[in-house]
Amino acid sequence: IGYFTNLFPNDPPTFVVMEARAADCLYQGALAGDGQPRIVEGDLKTIMAGLACGEPNILSWDILRNHVSAFVSCPDWVSARGMRMLGVPVKGDPTVISGESGAVGMGLIAAIMETDEYKELREAIGLDRFSQVLMFSTEGNTDPMKFRKVLWDGEYPTV
């Protein structure tokens, strides 16, 4: 985020941070609106194990709170949908084998574009059918059994 903000200081990209709902410390900090980070405690159970920290990195918090357009707290079905979409893409798109934490971006983009629940967010960040989106999947198939349950058995359905 810092890199792209410095690269395009007059017209930076729109940044969206996605977190597992069970461990949404950055989202909670942004929601509080006082500039202070938040720690989420308790049961951090989520399929997005790589995002289940519950405590923000203090050094990055300042950059995030100043340059991110939206923080989104995502339920597990968002990640599962992203895994399915990446793993079984539409004709012509490449297959991407992404784990739960890496696929949340794809699932969120789909939810933002396809559901009224995210209409306000879609408008706030200026996302439309002409937008160019760059996503990073930071995780491969780290749990083959869970991957199969999500893709083959429909675990965490969207409907």
Where are these regions (language model features)?
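Glycine-rich phosphate/pyrophosphate-binding loop at beta-loop-alpha junctions
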Residues: 1-66, 116, 121-159
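Active-site-adjacent helical/loop segments in soluble small-molecule enzymes
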Residues: 56-125
